[in-house]
Amino acid sequence: MEKRYKEILLTNEYGKLLEAKKKGIPAVPCLPVIYAENPITAGNEKIMAKEMDLSGYPYVLEQEEEVEKAYLEKIRCRLLGLPCEILQTRRCIVREICLADVDNLYEIYADPSITLYMEGLYAKKEEEIAYTRDYIRYQYGIYDFGMWIIEDRQSGEVIGRAGLDLRPDREDAELGYMIRKNRQGQGLAYEVCTAILAYAKEEFGFEKLFARTRKENLASVMLLKKLGFHPVCAQSETKEADNAQIEYYIVLP
């Protein structure tokens, strides 16, 4: 069996998998994998089965299963190192980050108001690039979600970030968001976050999400309340009361 999805080869023949690997063609094994369809070599299948190694293939499909086009597209993006599109709203596209976005992020984070209530980027761009490369490989590759890029649907301009993050001590995910200074006040964060809440429930089965913000960050507080979040408690209380974070939660319908 041999099929093509755009640049991706899908086959149950081990010989064709090896050939594709030599040529640099991204391929996906389809179970059950045999050594070859050729009846002349088919008699060696039992011997060859011991030598077949599929450990280097991050995706393996069942030959008979019906695979949705959206899943094949995600596999394609993963194998080719392309950012997957997550969702679209009326004005925005939400997609995974790629290394080409790093320059845009430094431009956005250069405005002091962006880092007033959140961490900035690495001081050295090469460190941010290395971090982003690992984030793509491990965060997206393992969990299939994370912080994403927000693009303007019409212009393609990177206008912010939003997404879901996991904390080591929590089972529920944290909602995060950031819109560049010159695009704030247009309802974009609400538009994108509303779509992400629905996506979190539908795609990953999250029943509850949380978010944290500083109490003096009134725009963020108002956004969370508008989204339906409820305050839990103040965290990280110190002598500097202004540094206290308030945690909010939402039970997804």
Show which residues each predicted segment covers.
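Conserved GNAT-fold acetyl-CoA-binding loop/helix
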Residues: 113-135, 145-146
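A short helix-loop-beta-strand connector motif used in the catalytic cores of GNAT acetyltransferases and
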Residues: 135-149, 160
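Hydrophobic residues in alpha-helical segments
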Residues: 109, 118, 139-141
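Repeat-unit-sized solenoid/scaffold elements
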Residues: 130-131, 135-137, 184, 188
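Acyl-donor (CoA/ACP) binding surface of acyl/acetyltransferases
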Residues: 1-9, 15-93, 97-103, 108-111, ...
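Conserved glycosyltransferase catalytic-site signature
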Residues: 13-14, 144
